[in-house]
Regions:
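Membrane-proximal, proline-rich intrinsically disordered regions
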Residues: 16-64, 411-414, 620-636
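Conserved, well-structured interaction surfaces
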Residues: 38-55, 59, 77-156, 172-215, ...
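Flexible, polar/acidic helix-loop-strand segments at domain edges
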Residues: 92, 332, 341, 350-489
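Long, intrinsically disordered, low-complexity segments
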Residues: 109, 188-190, 227, 253-255, ...
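Short coil/turn linking the two alpha-helices of tandem helical-hairpin repeats
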Residues: 153-154, 158-160, 225-237, 503-506
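Short coil/linker segments at helix-helix boundaries
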Residues: 159-179, 233-264
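Bacterial Sec-dependent N-terminal signal peptides
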Residues: 1-25
Length: 636
């Protein structure tokens, strides 16, 4: 049996060069590899193993947008991507052919699809499984096949549809696949997810099943697919892809905007939300004990309670809001691969800081993105001192939960919403980490600032709290607290529902209600309340027009889902990426030790994103050589 398993695993995990050769291995009796449940389970695990790891510092697309930056010496593949170093000869972070970085990377997702097809086509041969087990495992593989097609679609646009592994007798022409029209790929994904749903269990909540696909996950994923399907990049995209056609002259991207796609998105998202509610999911609220340093303030302060809700939101394992999480995170033992270690600040009093690198930093753009305490953008709040936001001021007694009373910090860092303080650290602010409450001192030479010319430093002067577990300690990798990376959570569905409804018929109470659920948990005023108040809003009534509300919804989404891997994809599907990703990166002057010199907005990096090229990733040149039926993406 052991020999069979080894052969089987070797069959599934082929070299990258063979990934889209969808002819099975030379082993004629493939069905023999599926005689026992043990082998079938190995096949299922292999199907899951191709899921990208967004908590890996060299594999995450979180770093590919304008959310985060690193010192030059710490460039990751995603940072290289956004600096304009992408190429077709050896694509950076390529899901089509796979890639490697520091000995790790991502295997081709076409290999993952092939692994799924292998299980789907053979699991019925297993002798020691019940029909119900076979159907459930097969349905999981069917879903994962749809998921991998979707990931390829949103990176490359038109892709080949690989629904089955071809027989060994297939001709050379049969295996030279072609790219399909984008709408056809979407329909295939919808149909494949639907095919999976009937055979899935309602909800996987047993300890050894966390992260495995169930009906709630499938319906929620279908919501996400439908939102992309309706969005400008994929719906009537004449702006960028008007000349991108196949050999028959057919446009790969449809050229006529179809508003009914938003109806589909609203329908699928409503169904997903109801499935979540029927299965007991809800927006997360912290129900544990506060840390000793917060014990008194927690019981007396709604602000501190909100910080706990938001700080543990994605870190409290398998909580009530998490619909789907990656059950195989990078982990504390993966050392140079761990994104949490890259963001974790160093303890200046620790004798070792092995797993606290302190060089993954939020950009100033992200610091400016979050709302004021009134729930308005900083440039829309009459009561916020927007024009002088880069100047410093003393922290008053009414701001002592936001920053250190009596200290001076930037006006930008004060009077902001709880999500800002939960997600981002700053000079003279607070940091809950290493099991302690730190009072941050971030100027050069200070306890949390850059030390001499070390390459471990926060280039913008901001630290990333959101992905760091408060109990993680950086003196060893074993002390990092692992958690499942959130792939889908309930807040996303509420915001997707609001987005779809607004695109269909404009503002309504139903749209406001969906957004307000997320805002209430964030501790900020309701959208229809604050945007109607001329004492606060510079543009009162902005929420009453479709265009105005669209802008509000987009910002709400970018705040709520910040640093989770959505921004790179959302800005592309909205066709806004070329506006955001082709701009400089700014931060504070972190090499300065004096206050007035430190609080200067300076250039810390440059991004490059070409509108006519970078919305799609390149197919590796060697793939085009091997398969003459493949057409390269525009301008690559």
């Amino acid at each position: 049996m052991k020999k069979i398993l080894l052969i089987f695993i070797g069959f599934l995990i082929m070299s990258c060069d063979d990934y889209l050769d969808i002819v099975p291995d030379k082993t004629q009796e493939l069905s023999l590899l599926f005689e026992r449940k043990e082998a079938a389970y190995t096949a299922l695990v292999t199907c899951y193993s191709y899921m990208p790891q967004n908590d890996g510092i060299y594999s995450t697309y979180v770093l590919a947008s304008d959310e985060l930056t690193t010192p030059f010496a710490k460039d990751t593949p995603a940072i290289e991507l956004m600096k304009g170093e992408q190429n077709a000869d050896n694509p950076i972070m390529g899901y089509w052919s796979g890639y490697s970085a520091l000995g790790r990377g991502q295997e081709s997702l076409f290999k993952g699809i092939r692994a799924c097809n292998t299980l789907i086509q053979n699991i019925d041969n297993v002798l020691d499984m019940t029909p119900e087990e076979k159907l459930n495992w097969k349905s999981e593989a069917i879903f994962l096949k749809a998921y991998y097609h979707f990931l390829l679609l949103i990176h490359y646009g038109p892709i080949p549809i690989v629904d089955v592994n071809l027989p060994i007798s297939s001709s050379v022409d049969d295996v030279k696949v072609r790219r399909e029209l984008v709408d056809d790929v979407f329909q295939y994904i919808f149909n494949t997810v639907d095919l999976s749903i009937d055979g899935l269990i309602e909800r996987n909540l047993t300890t050894n099943s966390f992260g495995r696909i169930d009906k709630v996950i499938a319906k929620s994923f279908k919501s996400r697919v439908s939102i992309y399907y309706a969005s400008p990049m994929f719906n009537g995209n004449t702006e960028i892809f008007s000349s991108f056609t196949n050999e028959n002259g057919e446009h790969y991207f449809n050229q006529i905007y179809d508003e009914t796609k938003w109806n589909l998105a609203a329908e699928y998202t409503s169904e997903a939300i109801q499935a979540c509610l029927d299965n007991g999911l809800s927006l997360y609220e912290y129900n544990g004990q506060p840390a000793a340093y917060d014990y008194t303030s927690y019981s007396n302060s709604n602000f501190i309670q909100k910080l706990y809700d938001l700080r543990y939101l994605i870190r409290d394992k398998w909580n009530s809001e998490l619909i789907w999480g990656n059950s195989k995170p990078v982990g504390s033992n993966d050392e140079w691969w761990n994104l949490q270690a890259g963001a974790l600040m160093k303890d200046p009093s620790a004798s070792r800081v092995e797993a606290a690198w302190q060089w993954v930093a939020p950009t100033m753009r992200m610091a400016e993105l979050y709302y004021t305490k009134n729930g308005l953008p900083i440039d829309e709040d009459i009561q916020f001192n927007f024009n002088n936001r880069y100047s410093t001021t003393y922290v008053g007694s009414n701001q002592m939960e936001e920053a250190q009373r009596g200290q001076q910090t930037a006006i930008l860092n004060l009077n902001r919403e709880p999500r800002f303080y939960s997600n981002i650290g700053f000079d003279r602010g607070f940091y809950r980490g290493w099991g302690e409450l730190w009072r941050l001192r971030m100027k050069k030479g200070e306890s949390h600032g850059r030390i001499a010319n070390s390459s471990d430093y926060l280039t913008t002067g901001y630290s990333l709290k959101k992905i760091v577990h408060p109990d993680s300690e950086g003196d060893s990798y074993g002390k990092l607290v692992d958690y499942p990376w959130p792939l889908i959570r309930l807040a996303e569905l509420y915001l997707s529902y609001a987005e779809a409804l607004n695109e269909i018929s404009g503002p309504s109470q139903e749209v406001f209600d969906a957004i307000n659920k997320v805002r209430a948990r964030a501790g900020i005023p309701m959208i229809d309340e604050i945007w109607s108040n001329p004492s606060f809003a510079k543009t009162p009534g902005k929420h009453t027009s479709r265009d105005g509300l669209r802008e509000i919804i987009h910002q709400e989404r970018m705040i709520e889902l910040a640093f989770e891997g959505h921004r790179y994809y959302d800005l592309r599907r909205w066709l806004k990426a070329h506006e955001y990703f082709n701009t400089p990166v700014f931060g504070w002057s972190v090499d300065e030790s004096e206050r007035d010199s430190y609080y200067q907005k300076i250039l810390v990096g440059q991004r490059t994103f070409l509108k006519e090229r970078d919305y799609l990733h390149p197919i590796k040149t060697t793939e085009l050589t091997r398969n003459s039926n493949l057409i390269q993406n525009p301008n690559w």
